[in-house]
């Protein structure tokens, strides 16, 4: 027997010590999240050429991070008494959003990884600390995200009669366009964003502890929630591979990397929705357009919107009319959604019935698309009118892309029910959680040996 004295038990943390440690951990999560978003947004803006903006790169970077958390950035313009400007921008750079959500969620859960269960008060304290610090950081970014740029109208190559007539006159009054952050809506949507990130982090984590009252919801919710996260990340990974191939084999790699760093999920999650039969509508007019594949830009400029001739419908058939390879979106969606359903079934308890798994998968997929489809919305407009009699086409344009949300959600529910059932059937051939191998008894009474001393 060892004569070494036993190690004394570590004293319990005092309330003040627990509060200080929780605050430091929350600060680390917030700083890591904002830092990751800033790095990704900075790389995307650099690839897009924003580093050449006269004194405005920092403000644009802050504005992109604000928009990535759901904040509202307002565009404004001033061209004196002779002209007016109209500007609007609604979009989320989802690559920045996704990276920030993953990093913040991971750092939020990391201190809890060794806990079997956690108290509701402790969980609320940790979440509340992250939320408060996140909103403080968002308010600081909002103060930085403001800048004005001067527009040079004359001397262009575009053949616009109004531009030729009024260009020099407008240059003399120094027309400008700028952006500001609307603090109230930014903090409100930022609050919803960070609460959603923390909630989703708890739902998709397979190891994070829950309060004892919520443990019973762990088995029916977490396997399918985790599988839906894997589905969204799988689409982003496929899009990343395709984007790298395009950057290596075609011209203008900087533009491709700008899309990868800023808006990759905007494209890949749209591809998921289109692949299951959903549709978007939109248009692209003027000299600028969406940083998207040429096939999508061609559809948006085609004006095939049926009764609403000014809008184009983006679905499988319209994309395939531009490039037949678009039909691959359908089998890719079938394979990846089935893989997600199978992964959820394997991680679910063996006692889960097929219809239960199908229903859970259908509801989870529908909720996933209820979140993923609306955030792909893009609305951007800018125009410069002279004396109210027209718009300078060389300095105006419009980009619109919005989903038919409820149609996409309904299709996701149907796909989840069908492929959830099929995934459960496939998983029934795999040993699953909670499954116990039954001993085999032979007619002669022989069987596996029992425990020592058993009769």
What residue spans do the PLM features occupy?
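Cytoplasmic membrane-interface segments at the C-terminal ends of transmembrane helices
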Residues: 11-24, 102-127, 143-150, 195-227, ...
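N-terminal acidic, proline/glycine-rich, low-complexity intrinsically disordered segments
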Residues: 1-6
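Selective recognition of specific alpha-helical transmembrane segments in multi-pass small-molecule
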Residues: 31-39, 130-142, 227-243, 367-368, ...
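Long, glycine/tryptophan/cysteine-rich extracytoplasmic
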Residues: 11-99, 143-182, 243-333, 371-447
